[in-house]
């Protein structure tokens, strides 16, 4: 009996099967194209499910699967003695990947009905979790060149499906703007906050505050951990970021590289032209931030500059080609993120932003930071 799965789940599974079938991966360019003459052979992929770990050894014609557990103390893979190894032709994974790709391209909506043939294959190879289950937020880990090579942790993004954001807003990712200028009475505040829901209600409230003589000026990061994480990029980075989010709402510009171009003109940090144009200060700081996010920085977790288990990203493009980005080529990785990310709007009610609220006698207006990858 067929079952349904989300496009995001199937996008991750497609990427995994494509790598098993191909036994290699293309390195990507900053513009999300294949980097010529730069293929990385894959010897083994490790994937975690709810009932343990699997190691998929890519041999000449087959994929050999070893079932095991990750020992918590040493973080080493230990094979299970009560489960036999199994092998399947690589062409079977190629056929399964093609089925998923066809479904992703042809079916609309968030969920897809998985055909009986694909369901049967998943049961045969004992894949029960369509998305990997890890504590370190990696989707898969890869041994390049040789099966005993050190494992490299990757997150997966697929442009054929909705993608997990690089920075998933939430109320911990709120920035506080202080309302100054005219002192608002409670009825005025209520009038601002009562503007009806719409795709542009944050912009409409900000413009209304301005029309009524109010001024919104960056004050602080709402969450102390996220504040410190941003300060690790630069002591003035929160101010720059808040100006970008403000521009996104007021001018409708969402792409990160375009927003940074506007920031260079506005120059909210009042730095010298030489620093802006010759040294590329604003671009550099944004790329630093995006790379930190891609390698594991989160709003509510203390960031000390040490990378997490995630060392790179696998990006599947709209044609089903998998591109690999790794921190060893941090320049290309950062340029790719800079050219292919955008600011997004999180839900106002859930993330608690976009309205005036009183705190210690002063009114504040919060903006929310959410960053995702563009579809194309």
Regions from the PLM with identified roles:
Residues 1-136, 143-152, 156-376:
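Short, positively charged
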């Amino acid at each position: 009996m067929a079952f349904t799965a989300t496009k995001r789940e199937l996008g991750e599974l497609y990427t995994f099967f494509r790598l098993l079938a191909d036994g290699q991966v293309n390195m990507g360019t900053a513009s999300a194209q294949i980097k010529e003459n730069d293929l990385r052979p894959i010897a083994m992929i490790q994937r975690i499910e709810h009932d343990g770990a699997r190691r998929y050894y890519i041999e000449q014609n087959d994929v050999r699967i070893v079932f095991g557990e990750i020992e918590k103390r040493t973080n080493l893979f230990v094979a299970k003695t009560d489960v036999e190894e199994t092998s399947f032709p690589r062409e079977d994974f190629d056929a399964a990947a093609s089925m998923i790709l066809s479904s992703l391209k042809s079916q609309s909506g968030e969920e897809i009905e998985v055909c009986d043939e694909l369901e049967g294959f998943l049961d045969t190879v004992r894949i029960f979790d369509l998305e990997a289950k890890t504590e370190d937020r990696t989707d898969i880990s890869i041994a390049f060149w040789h099966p005993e090579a050190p494992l490299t942790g990757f997150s997966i993004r697929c442009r054929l499906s909705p993608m997990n954001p690089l920075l998933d807003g939430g109320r911990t990712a709120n920035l506080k703007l202080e309302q100054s200028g005219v002192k608002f009475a409670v009825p005025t505040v209520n009038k601002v906050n009562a503007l009806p829901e719409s795709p542009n209600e944050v912009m409409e409230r900000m413009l209304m505050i301005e029309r009524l003589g109010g001024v919104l000026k960056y004050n602080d990061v709402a969450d102390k951990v996220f504040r410190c994480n941003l300060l690790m990029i630069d002591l003035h980075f929160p101010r720059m970021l808040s100006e970008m989010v403000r521009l996104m709402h007021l001018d409708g510009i969402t792409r990160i590289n375009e927003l940074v171009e506007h920031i260079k003109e506005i120059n909210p940090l009042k730095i010298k032209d030489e620093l802006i144009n010759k040294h590329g200060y604003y671009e550099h700081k944004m790329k630093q931030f995006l790379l930190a996010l891609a390698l594991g920085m989160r709003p509510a977790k203390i960031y000390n500059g040490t990378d997490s288990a995630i060392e790179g990203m696998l990006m599947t493009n709209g044609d089903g080609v998998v591109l690999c980005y790794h921190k060893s080529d941090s320049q290309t990785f950062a340029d790719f993120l800079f050219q292919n990310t955008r600011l997004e709007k999180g839900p106002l009610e859930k993330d608690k932003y976009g309205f005036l609220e009183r705190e210690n006698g002063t009114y504040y207006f919060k903006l929310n930071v959410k960053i995702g990858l563009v579809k194309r």
